[in-house]
Structure formats: structure tokens, C-alpha cells
Amino acid sequence: MLQPARTKYRKMQKGRMRGKAYRGSDLAQGEYGLQATECGRLTSRQIEAARVAITRYVKRGGKLWIRVFPDKPITKKPAETRMGTGKGNVEFYVAVIKPGRVLYELAGVDDASAKKAFHLAAHKLPVATKMVKRGETL
């Protein structure tokens, strides 16, 4: 599972997801990309499940880049615990996704294979996505 090796602070505030992504919204390496069209949070398990779906479909062909990393800790209190007594323990890490963010990039495959692979991956993700190609306006 993806998570930071070490962090400056153990816990983080909840925050809000507003606006759209300006950084990470263009294709950097691949010919095709999977771009988020709404905001949300991706856990390391969801990122890994989508990666496995893509790599299993394209098999040995193509190169895949993961463009997001879960660096925000999410805390949770134990069940049947009274309120108060501080913030809960870190349970998992998430990547905060804004609309326009490219999640995955793919190269070395044809158009139909990339579309099908990203379609399979999109079913594993909690945010709406679309496929983008290099050269088209994003």
C-alpha cells in the first residue's frame, strides 16, 4: 500500500475540497490519461485496485504512471468511544483529488486498449473520470 515513509506531523486537519486542479492536470509522460471530473478522496487501496485493473488488461504491453500519492492521514476513533479525549489514531492515507487532476497515464498501447483499461479502472474509483489524449485540449 502507498503511504508516506515519514511525515513531519502525524495527524492533519480535515480541510475542504474546493475549486479545480491546476497542477497535475496535463499529461506529463504518457499518450493517454485518466482525468478526474469531480472532487473526492482516493485511498491507497483504491489507487492500487485501479492500477491492478489497468496492468492486468494491458498485460505486458504499455507503460503505466501513477500520478497521485496518498499523503493525507485520516484518523478514526474506536467503536463505542465517548466524544472527547482527543483525536483518534491514523487509520489510512488518502490522496485529495480535485476536478481536472490526471490520476493515471498510459503509453505504448492503442486507443481502444487504453479506453477499455481506463474504463475498468474507473469502476474501482469513487470519483467520476474521463479519458484524455495527448494533443487534445484538456
Swiss-Prot record:
Task: Name the InterPro entries for this protein.
Answer: Ribosomal_uL16 (IPR047873), Ribosomal_uL16_bact-type (IPR000114), Ribosomal_uL16_CS (IPR020798), Ribosomal_uL16_dom (IPR016180), Ribosomal_uL16_sf (IPR036920)
Disulfide partners: none
GO molecular function term, any single one = tRNA binding
Q: Which GO terms describe its cellular component?
A: cytosolic large ribosomal subunit
Q: Which PROSITE patterns match?
A: RIBOSOMAL_L16_1 (PS00586)
Q: Which CDD domains match?
A: Ribosomal_L16_L10e (cd01433)
Q: Transmembrane stretches, by residue range?
A: none
Q: Pfam families, alphabetically?
A: Ribosomal_L16
Q: Which GO terms describe its biological process?
A: translation
Its signal peptide is: none
How does it associate, per the subunit comment? Answer: Part of the 50S ribosomal subunit.
NCBIfam families in the record? rplP_bact (TIGR01164)
Role? Binds 23S rRNA and is also seen to make contacts with the A and possibly P site tRNAs.
Family recorded in the similarity comment: Belongs to the universal ribosomal protein uL16 family.
Query: What is the protein name for this chain?
Result: Large ribosomal subunit protein uL16
